[in-house]
Amino acid sequence: MLGFTYSFSVWRGDVDPVFPYISAAGDNRPEACMFSMFLNICSFLSMLIVYLRYSLVAELNRSSDLLLKSFNRLNLYAGLLGASGMFLVANFQETAVIQVHLFGAFLCFGSGCVYMLGQAWISYRMYPLFSGIRIAKIRGVMAIASVCLFFMAFGFGWAAANTFHSVFPDLPTPRPWTHKLVPMPATICTVSQR
């Protein structure tokens, strides 16, 4: 779905084709309309997948493990919170309301990391009856990598903004795609969460 927005943005020259900054595709019209529409669909589908996974774990577990049952419900909330953050990113463009957009992105990726860690723990907890150890290890590695990359992206972005403002205190923070900077940690974090 978002591939169409990406292709259109690259064709118009609004994003870098190798490492596109995700929010850049959602700032210019008509890409903004397509980006919002497709990201809303993705957010809804994410909520559906999170709920289906919750239901599957709840059904397989029933009442045999009360800790797993409680943790599964908490993980459902983390997943739904992450998908809600995706709604915020979709509907509040970066140039319109930057605070809400960044809050939504932080909520989406932060809650997504928590959800991934929770799913890894659930997979380990359900081993050997309902889950294989291989998939549990894969989920664990991906979750840890996602958390590390999330903190790297947040830390480097914060450090870069502070460094820029210490040199140019009166200028707004430059947008990465206008200066050909590659937001590599954010890109890797995005890819690792899928």
What do these predicted ranges mean?
Residues 58-71, 97, 127-135:
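Membrane-interface helix-boundary motifs at transmembrane edges
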